Design a protein with these regions (language model features):
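Residue-identity detector for threonine
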Residues: 26-28, 38-40, 68, 86, ...
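Long, charged alpha-helical interface segments
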Residues: 92, 97-173
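Short beta-strand segments
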Residues: 58-60, 88, 117-118
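Acidic/Gly/His-enriched mid-domain segments of enzyme catalytic cores or analogous surface patches
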Residues: 1-81
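Short, acidic/small-residue loops that bind anionic groups at enzyme active sites
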Residues: 77-94
Length: 173
């Protein structure tokens, strides 16, 4: 992924059980194959320790649903730390919308769809404006996910805000 973006890493972290050892002259932390944290969680914790604020996670959504869900939960961890995290895959972008944001999340009409998924308890005060399916101060629970597959109105931007709790925002290109 790094080569495709023309990025040279400052730090490489992993156990290299599924990839060969990197051929970069870069600081590398080699992890044991058997450990409590995944490579990605360890890397994010190390970046937090080093003072990073914004996190772009690429290549963390794939064939293994367990790893994908674990990586999505990293976004919750980052939000709890007051940091910003985004996951990007071939089709979508994911981020957390929470009461910590302090302002509405803006979604432009370049996205085909967007969904709000509750992945952590009851979320209250959910407001969606500028979308095909608006909401005003609604409640979304894990059991009732009615924020799936919404659309930004043509020529508009949608705004999403949360009064209490956290939602996963998935913007589909």
């Amino acid at each position: 992924h790094m080569d495709g973006f023309g990025v040279e890493p400052d730090l490489i972290v992993g156990d290299f059980d599924s990839y060969s050892y990197p051929e970069y002259d870069t600081e590398t932390i080699v992890l044991p194959c058997e450990k409590d944290d995944t490579d990605t969680v360890f890397a994010v914790k190390e970046a937090l320790r080093r003072g990073f604020e914004d996190f772009l996670l690429i290549g963390v959504v794939g064939e293994r649903l367990d790893h994908t869900l674990g990586n999505v939960s990293i976004l919750l961890m980052l939000d709890s730390e007051g940091k910003v995290g985004t996951i990007i895959d071939d089709y979508s972008e994911m981020e957390i919308v929470s009461d910590r944001c302090g302002k509405p999340c803006i979604i432009d009409d370049s996205y085909v769809y967007f969904s709000l998924i509750n992945i952590s308890g009851t979320v209250r005060g959910v407001t969606i404006r500028g979308a095909k399916y608006p909401l005003e101060a609604a409640e979304i629970t894990c059991e009732y996910q009615y924020g799936v597959s919404n659309e930004v109105l043509p020529g508009c931007t949608a705004e999403v805000s949360v009064g209490e709790g956290k939602l996963l925002l998935i913007k589909v290109r």
